[in-house]
A protein has these predicted regions:
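Extracytosolic ligand-binding ectodomains
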Residues: 3-9, 21-399
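Repetitive helical segments and hydrophobic/amphipathic motifs
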Residues: 11-13
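Sec/Tat signal peptide C-region and signal peptidase I cleavage site
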Residues: 15-21
Length: 399
């Protein structure tokens, strides 16, 4: 009786009593499943985990008396491993919100599990537009970027600058195939041609045979529909083979980590599309300074998005007083995102988080004035133009 009386007093004082009863397992639990050891680990990995921890620390008390916990795991770039871990976490660990890191195949698999278990799934590092198109779910948010935005940024810009004839070097799984298809659509719509493509396995060790096929095509542009370590190794190999004397490289998904690894001598003048840059404005620089102090490197778009997604999820839980997935998703879809990652970001009914993207040009060594000063913003691509429109969408939730 004393406990009930105390609870009644707290309710009268304005505490979120009903809400407290709606925190599952008395813990708000966030999980991150990403590549921690493979070709994509540098662009997300431990840096992504650190970014989520920063968000949890910055959020402070979300619901009085309820802890916020965080766990992370390596999916090894295997969809079955990702799905199994996600299912285990939902069933046994009580994870309320799952962040999907790099690799489209793993995120598509995790999105299915999250939808089945009715838990919030934030896809950060995966590029395939299927996550908010053909395979959209009521619980998926596709947060940072997608292959449509990359194609409409980099692909469109290069064709309009005279790069009409293309050949693709494509990572042979969901992300690479989506990126090639979406960029092909943009090329053809702008009067260009695709002369062919060659597929390589994820984590390929030798690109020589693939590049010889590309060279034989006599295309102007070699579109790199890959990312991370694969993009780095294919660019290095292209220079070693002298391919760049006859073809222009188009990195369709290049991260600042990749530029840092390759150096400006190899990457100067390259166009790329990014959704975020550490040196964009005062807000991005302030957050990146804190991140740099922990990781000793500047953050990628994905690591910044990991922070933003976790923070905005926790803001939703705090506002509602519950981690109920349906209520949280409804709140997120009606609330604009304004933080160091996105300005006036909107989560549509299909789960796509719409925000501006940026066409970047990599600086010449002589133009770079301080460490990690790598990009010049060529153009802003408004979110409404970057992503699929309602007329183009195949998502049953957005009709």
């Amino acid at each position: 009786m004393k406990l009930n009386a105390t609870a009644a007093v707290l309710c009268a004082l304005g505490w979120t009593c009903a809400a407290q009863a709606q925190i599952s397992g008395d813990v708000i639990k966030i999980g991150l499943i990403t590549d921690m050891s493979g070709v994509y680990s540098d662009i997300d990995g431990q840096g992504g985990a650190e970014a989520v921890k920063m968000a949890i620390a910055d959020a402070g008390v979300v619901v009085p008396g309820k802890r916020v916990e965080f766990i992370s795991a390596d999916h090894q770039n295997k969809a079955d491993v990702a799905a199994s871990k996600a299912r285990e976490w939902f069933d046994q660990q009580g994870v309320d919100m799952l962040i999907g890191g790099t690799n489209s195949g793993t995120s598509l698999a995790m999105a299915k599990v999250a939808a089945d278990k009715k838990r919030v799934f934030m896809a950060i590092g995966a590029g395939t537009s299927r996550l908010s198109n053909e395979e959209c779910t009521p619980y998926t948010v596709h947060y940072a970027y997608d292959t449509v935005a990359l194609a409409r940024g980099t692909g469109s810009a290069i064709v309009k600058r005279g790069g009409k004839n293309w050949y693709f070097l494509t990572a042979d799984y969901a992300f690479g195939l989506s990126l090639e298809k979406d960029t092909t659509d943009v090329i053809k719509a702008n009067g260009g041609k695709v002369l062919g493509s060659v597929k390589h396995p994820l984590g390929a060790s030798d690109f020589s045979s693939f590049l010889l096929q590309a060279q034989a095509s006599n295309a102007q542009i070699l579109g790199l529909a890959n990312a991370g370590g694969d993009a780095i190794n294919s660019i290095k190999a292209a220079y070693e083979f002298g391919l760049t004397k006859k073809m222009t490289l188009a990195g369709l998904l290049i991260f600042i980590n990749d530029i840092h690894t390759l150096g400006l001598n190899l990457t100067q003048g390259m166009y790329l599309t990014d959704g975020w840059y550490w040196d964009m404005n005062a807000d991005t620089r302030a957050w990146s300074k804190r991140y740099f102090e922990k990781m000793k490197k500047e953050p990628s778009m994905l690591q910044a998005a990991d922070y933003s997604a976790a923070m905005n999820y926790l803001k939703a839980v705090k506002a509602l007083g519950t981690d109920d997935a349906d209520k949280v998703m409804a709140y997120l879809k009606k609330t604009r995102i304004n933080d160091m990652f996105a300005k006036d970001g909107e989560i549509r009914p299909d789960g796509r988080m719409v925000h501006d993207m940026y066409l970047m040009e990599v600086k010449k060594p002589s133009e770079s004035k301080y460490p990690w000063d790598y990009y010049r913003v060529v153009a802003t691509v408004p979110g409404a133009q970057a992503y699929l429109t309602k007329a183009e969408s195949k998502c049953a939730l957005w009709k």
